[in-house]
Amino acid sequence: MLRTGAPNGDLPRAGEVHTGTTIMAVEFDGGVVVGSDSRVSAGEAVVNRVFDKLSPLHQHIYCALSGSAADAQAIADMAAYQLELHGMELEEPPLVLAAANVVRNITYKYREDLSAHLMVAGWDQREGGQVYGTMSGMLIRQPFAIGGSGSTYIYGYVDAAYKPGMSPEECRRFTTNAIALAMKRDGSSGGVIYLATITGAGVDHRVILGDELPRFYDE
């Protein structure tokens, strides 16, 4: 299994646990939708079918995890700790851009030791909903982003289906359809779909179970 963000495109170490994955985030006016599948594997074995890959960094900021499960969670934990201190010093919630910079810096600093890619998405009072990619020390804001091993199967779909100005419900449907398509094609993605809709009012968590997933023409 090749992992997005793995140094030099290397293969996983034997027995290592991976979130070999489909993750996605979409901006809308007033917030973001972030989603993921839930399969975790070690080699050929599925070790967790319902792992939530959406990890909170702060009250209105989440990251989506891919790569080595342990490495990705370690980066998320370090970033959450730094952002908590940052918020205490400023006496106000951190910006989403600040969170993305923290994740980017950790990922780049430990690029030879940790194999993970985190997508950062959230809401703040200055810029509203934002989505950032942080792979390999890069930092770029996008209206939507996909990642993980399953993303290679859905580039055509998301490019064709994305429309600027979508409502929160349209973004949830767009994210659900894209991840379900990836889960159908990618053997390293599967399980259920976790969704988080982040706005100034808070975070709305949803789980799309297996019998609720969209069905496509070949099923």
Swiss-Prot record:
Localisation: Cytoplasm; Nucleus
PROSITE patterns reported in the protein's UniProt record: PROTEASOME_BETA_1 (PS00854), PROTEASOME_BETA_2 (PS51476)
Keyword Magnesium in annotation: no
Entry keywords, A to Z: Acetylation, Cytoplasm, Hydrolase, Immunity, Nucleus, Protease, Proteasome, Threonine protease, Zymogen
InterPro entries linked to this entry: Ntn_hydrolases_N, Pept_T1A_subB, Proteasome_bsu_CS, Proteasome_sua/b, Proteasome_suB-type
Reaction catalyzed: Cleavage of peptide bonds with very broad specificity
Residues cleaved off as propeptide: 1-20
EC number: 3.4.25.1
GO biological process, one term: proteasome-mediated ubiquitin-dependent protein catabolic process
Residues in the signal sequence: none
Domain of life the protein comes from: Eukaryota
Main localization category: cytoplasm
Parts of the chain that traverse the membrane: none
Upregulation: Up-regulated by interferon gamma (at protein level).
N6-acetyllysine found at: 53, 109
GO cellular component: cytosol; nucleus; proteasome core complex; proteasome core complex, beta-subunit complex; spermatoproteasome complex
This protein's record includes keyword Metal-binding: no
Recorded family membership: Belongs to the peptidase T1B family.
Protein name per UniProt: Proteasome subunit beta type-9
Species of the source: Bos taurus (Bovine)
Lineage per the UniProt record: Eukaryota, Metazoa, Chordata, Craniata, Vertebrata
